[in-house]
């Protein structure tokens, strides 16, 4: 039993605050974790990247290694990375990067580093923000209520099978396609069979959440 909300605005506006109100109204649908896929004002150059670090204490060193994967693909940070100032062990990181020569190839390399810094979204305007706890708590921690954009998705999760963690939360980025995010409510009964088939074709999964299969 999870909760899903969506919002579209004709012109850029307070999409974060609107989605927060929608998610607060269905907090009874699940409060293990909450996530938002927010579409803001597109960057003129490069991509917005959201990532999750499981170990805040090593974040600075991990970002340097992450930067090396960017440089290997003809990219680099266009701005200094920023992250939340919470006291949790994990940290949500926001980056603006130059466009890699081949986005899919860079994502494959970056995913090998996911134990240290997991890419959760890439796009011209998409930013996926997700974390443990209720919508209001997640929004306050990450400033969701101040986000300006045109559309977005929200998801309140009540975990049934896979773990409760920031990375297993919804929404999911449809890697490696920029600006594509999904949320899902339900259970995919042939998840493991389908996952095994896709892994044999070279697809990489970051969690055991069946929604990632979509």
Label for each model-derived stretch:
Residues 1-214:
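Conserved short alpha-helical segments that host acidic/polar catalytic motifs at enzyme active sites
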């Amino acid at each position: 039993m999870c909760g899903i909300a969506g919002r579209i605005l004709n012109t850029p506006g307070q999409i974060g605050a609107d989605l927060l109100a929608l998610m607060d109204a269905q907090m009874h649908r699940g409060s293990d974790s909450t996530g938002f896929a927010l579409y803001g004002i597109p960057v003129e150059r490069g991509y917005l990247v959201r990532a999750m670090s499981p170990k805040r204490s090593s974040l600075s060193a991990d970002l340097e290694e992450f930067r090396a994967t960017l440089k290997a693909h003809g990219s680099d940070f266009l701005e200094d990375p920023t992250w939340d100032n919470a006291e949790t062990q994990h940290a949500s990181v926001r980056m603006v990067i130059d466009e890699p020569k081949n986005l899919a190839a860079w994502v494959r390399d970056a995913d090998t580093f996911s134990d240290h810094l997991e890419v959760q979204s890439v796009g011209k305007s998409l930013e996926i923000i997700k974390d443990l706890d209720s919508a209001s708590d997640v929004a306050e921690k990450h400033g969701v209520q101040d986000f300006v954009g045109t559309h977005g998705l929200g998801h309140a999760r009540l975990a049934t099978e896979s773990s409760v963690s920031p990375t297993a939360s919804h929404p999911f980025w449809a890697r490696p396609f920029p600006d594509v995010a999904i949320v899902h409510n339900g259970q995919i009964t042939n998840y493991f069979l389908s996952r095994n088939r896709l892994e044999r074709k070279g697809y990489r999964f970051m969690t055991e959440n069946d929604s990632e299969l979509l």
